[in-house]
Amino acid sequence: MRIAFLGTPAPAVPTLRALVANGHEVVIVVTRPDKKRGRGGELSPSPVKAAALELGLNVSHTLKDLYNVDAELGVVVAYGAMIPAAMLEVVPMLNVHFSLLPRWRGAAPVERAILSGDKETGVCIMTLEEALDTGPVHLEQRISIGEKTSSELLDELSILGAKALCEVVGSEELLKNADPQVGEPTYAEKLNSETFNLKNTESATQLARIVRLGRAFTFIGERRFKVLEAHALEHQGEPGTFTVVGGTPALVTSEGALALDVVQPEGSKSMAGSAWWLGAHLEPSSAHWG
């Protein structure tokens, strides 16, 4: 099948590679423009563009190029922008969405599932419509979330999504048949810096979920303090103070305490929370965070 692929970040790459490996003719790859990345600020391609060039595929940054390739089907995986309705008239499109629709339509479905304490998530292969993630579903696959980080979950979902997409594309029955989404929709709003700010008014369980997203931080005094790995403990104490359990420091919250397994103080490398605590010379009851 002649396929146009639209995608940008790393989780989209397994689907692109799977389509090629399964013998489909990827006639064009449309991805977002090169961006400045890293400390040097040099322009670098998106992960999808890098993979497409490695595979010898035709790459474009312009959706209008879809008019010129005579594709039979479009496949969209985290493209990073809305697809205009006019483009959906050029070629029918399938979208690989990393949630169990209609739950978590939108930009950050994996992270919102973790933050909400969902027990499971999954992948839906859906027909792309003009409205946001509303199309009928051709195939759904489920996985448990457990204590996985967002990075671990995305890695797993990207592989699952690639297999599911190829199953749909390879089956005339699955391609022709799709079920309307059933249930109350929820929306996965974009994350911002405040999403990752650990506050002592939250429960330890909720803070542990935030840590699993990566980028979690708080403040000790006026210094920014990153929390890389942590887990929730049962504890009663004054929120905003510290406690120590088995040599590991923990942030006392409104409900329980957050044990600091791996941290990165401002201006330092990452280290075990216990090692940081030994060198910090803080008093648990008088030191404050948040």
Model-identified regions with their sequence ranges:
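Structural motif
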Residues: 8-9, 195
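Short alpha-helical
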Residues: 10-11, 82, 132, 225
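Internal anion-binding site segments
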Residues: 182-290
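Donor/substrate-binding cores of folate-linked one-carbon enzymes
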Residues: 22, 73-187
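A short, local hydrophobic-aromatic micro-motif
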Residues: 27, 94, 135-138, 228, ...
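Nucleotide donor/acceptor-binding cores
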Residues: 1
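A short, Lys/Arg-enriched amphipathic alpha-helix followed by its capping loop at the start of a domain
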Residues: 18-24
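Active-site-proximal cofactor/substrate-binding loop regions of enzyme domains
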Residues: 4-8, 14, 29-32, 37-47, ...
